Amino acid sequence: MAYYIVRAKPKPDRLNELKERLGRHAFVQMRPFGQALTRALNDARIQADGTAIWEEEDYCSPPLAEERAAVLDTYFEGITVERVQEGEGWKQIANLPRLGETNISEASY
């Protein structure tokens, strides 16, 4: 299994829907990635420029192929990944505000 830091620009017109679906655990049953994706998105952070950032575990090549097709491309654009050791991504972003607690229109672009 590999771990990645994921950076992506949330689509502002879809962010409330994403928050609502995460609140209903709508992605948890998606196999094989639903639980990990739900955990990661619930803990995602937001950078000052409005970029969402989180650590994700993944088995796919290319990384996040299934997650992008099923969920991520609906809610984010400009998705990039960088390989990290497990937990290192979360350490790097621990002090950033949570995506779910941020009004995306307040973030500076």
Question: Model segments located where?
Answer:
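Conserved short beta-strand edge segments in small beta-sheet-based binding/regulatory domains
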Residues: 33, 77-91
